[in-house]
């Protein structure tokens, strides 16, 4: 270990020459060498924030520096102190019951310690998926089996799967919990055939209590792997073992998925996760800031939450970028600094000017109403209601006066605009379907 420390100290001296002083002081100075195993050098970072920044910005530079010093190509891995117990590859072997099946490995090694129910931020877009996941964790194979969670990238599907695993292990330490991606399942299956170890492969995945399999859409078009997973699914389900599956789309939309697999995925509960609303995005940022011990002004969180609405990973990444930028230029964090820090990833950070025409077009797209109908005298519900929504949004999203809005809707009186605004405002408080439609329109306008 002394040699490793000496090597890292030498590397730090070289790195100090290659980066700016603020960068070195902020990111590199407080790191230490943890271990060197099989051409992988593990470096300890002081906290999760620093680890993430080092991984994304300094891995290549560190590898090059170490190559110059040693002539060896070393892979770099970063850890944080609280995760060393789970990740230290030099720990002595754990004493296991001889009767216990080793094939599935230690479940803890496959679960991210950050992804628990406690760290999951609940919002309108994920509330049902969270409740279903917790129910499954509390009573595996008794609540919903399988549980199928689908949604876009970075919305929390993997977080919930890991949370289920952690909860099960915490309440039943002897439970065999296996988490893996369907890509890994496919690769291991192919290797087992090549190495004539198909029996070992089947024993590994058909003798677990909880199987958590991520990104099942990867199986699309892979007939042999689908066949194997079909039998794995049946074996586990028949033994009342819990299966949790995630995907970027519902089963019926996964192309070239065998019907028999599709039907089994639909046996239990299918739940989706949608992008977080503004309130949830702010809550996510607050939780992230608290976890990292960061003091972030509310105006900055609101700015980031308004600019990043696609997924949680990008949201947290934007926060990290703002904090890093503040540290590097040694300035306090405020909304102006946040805008400067994010200008490369939010090129149009200045608010978009929305016109009444834009609103009419967006509402027309959602409700299939022709542009000319917004100005026509038609009073059928299929036209009148979308027209009222467009008037409401024109009042909310533009600086146009009431008479101007009325003029753009066929010369209607300003009292008609007021009535439309009041009606839609009232409906939005209780009508969830309307809320979703207005949110969809807002998304188009952005």
Swiss-Prot record:
Keywords recorded for this protein, A-Z: ATP-binding, Cytoplasm, DNA replication, DNA-binding, Lipid-binding, Nucleotide-binding
ATP-binding recorded as keyword: yes
Residues at which ATP binds: 154, 156-158
Region ranges (Domain IV, binds dsDNA): 327-446
InterPro entries: AAA+_ATPase (IPR003593), Chromosome_initiator_DnaA (IPR001957), Chromosome_initiator_DnaA-like (IPR020591), Chromosome_initiator_DnaA_CS (IPR018312), DnaA_C (IPR013159), DnaA_dom (IPR013317), DnaA_N_dom (IPR024633), DnaA_N_sf (IPR038454)
Gene Ontology BP, a term: regulation of DNA replication
Listed CDD domains: AAA, Bac_DnaA_C
Molecular function per GO: ATP binding; ATP hydrolysis activity; DNA replication origin binding; lipid binding
Domain I, interacts with DnaA modulators: annotated span: 1-81
CC per GO annotation: cytoplasm; plasma membrane
Superkingdom in the source lineage: Bacteria
Residue ranges of the region described as Domain II: 81-109
Subcellular location: Cytoplasm
Region described as Domain III, AAA+ region: 110-326
The protein's assembly and partners: Oligomerizes as a right-handed, spiral filament on DNA at oriC.
Comment field on protein domains: Domain I is involved in oligomerization and binding regulators, domain II is flexibile and of varying length in different bacteria, domain III forms the AAA+ region, while domain IV binds dsDNA.
Family the entry assigns: Belongs to the DnaA family.
HAMAP family from the UniProt entry: DnaA_bact (MF_00377)
Functional note: Plays an essential role in the initiation and regulation of chromosomal replication. ATP-DnaA binds to the origin of replication (oriC) to initiate formation of the DNA replication initiation complex once per cell cycle. Binds the DnaA box (a 9 base pair repeat at the origin) and separates the double-stranded (ds)DNA. Forms a right-handed helical filament on oriC DNA; dsDNA binds to the exterior of the filament while single-stranded (ss)DNA is stabiized in the filament's interior.
Protein name per Swiss-Prot or TrEMBL: Chromosomal replication initiator protein DnaA
């Amino acid at each position: 270990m002394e040699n490793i420390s000496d090597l890292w100290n030498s590397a730090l001296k070289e790195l100090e020459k290659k980066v700016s002083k603020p960068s070195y002081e902020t990111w590199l100075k407080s790191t230490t060498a943890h271990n060197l195993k099989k051409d992988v050098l593990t470096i300890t970072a002081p906290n999760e924030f620093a680890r993430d920044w080092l991984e994304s910005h300094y891995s290549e530079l560190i590898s090059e520096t170490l190559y110059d010093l040693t002539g060896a190509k070393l892979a770099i891995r970063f850890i944080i102190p609280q995760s060393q117990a789970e990740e230290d590859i030099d720990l002595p072997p754990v004493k296991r019951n001889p009767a216990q099946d080793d094939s599935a490995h230690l479940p803890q090694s496959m679960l991210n310690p950050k992804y628990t129910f406690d760290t999951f931020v609940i919002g309108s877009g994920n509330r049902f998926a969270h409740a279903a996941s917790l129910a499954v964790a509390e009573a595996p194979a008794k609540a919903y089996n399988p549980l199928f969670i689908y949604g876009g990238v970075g919305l929390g599907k993997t977080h919930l799967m890991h949370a289920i695993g952690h909860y099960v292990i915490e309440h039943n330490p002897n439970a065999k919990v296996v988490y893996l991606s369907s890509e890994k399942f496919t690769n291991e299956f192919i290797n087992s055939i090549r190495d004539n170890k198909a029996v070992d492969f089947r024993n590994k995945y058909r003798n677990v209590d909880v199987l958590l399999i991520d990104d099942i859409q990867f199986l699309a078009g892979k007939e042999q792997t689908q066949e194997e997973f079909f039998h794995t699914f049946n074996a586990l389900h028949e033994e009342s073992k819990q299966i949790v599956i995630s995907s970027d789309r519902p089963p019926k939309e996964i192309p070239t998925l065998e019907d028999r697999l599709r039907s089994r995925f639909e046996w239990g509960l299918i739940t989706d996760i949608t992008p977080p609303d503004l309130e949830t995005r702010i809550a996510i940022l607050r939780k992230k800031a608290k976890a990292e011990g960061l003091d972030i002004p509310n105006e900055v969180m609101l700015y980031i939450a308004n600019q990043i609405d696609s997924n949680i990973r990008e949201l947290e990444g934007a926060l990290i970028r703002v904090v890093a930028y503040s540290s590097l230029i040694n300035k306090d964090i405020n909304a102006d600094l946040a805008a400067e820090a994010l200008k490369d990833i939010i090129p149009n950070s200045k608010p978009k000017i929305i016109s009444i025409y834009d609103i009419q077009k967006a509402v027309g797209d959602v409700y299939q109403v022709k542009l000319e109908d917004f100005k026509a005298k038609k009073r059928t519900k299929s036209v009148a209601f979308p027209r009222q929504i467009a008037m409401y949004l024109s009042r909310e999203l533009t600086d146009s006066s009431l008479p101007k809005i009325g003029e753009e809707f066929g010369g209607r009186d300003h009292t008609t605009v007021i009535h439309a605004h009041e009606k839609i405002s009232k409906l939005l408080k209780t009508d969830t379907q309307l809320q979703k439609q207005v949110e969809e329109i807002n998304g188009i306008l952005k």
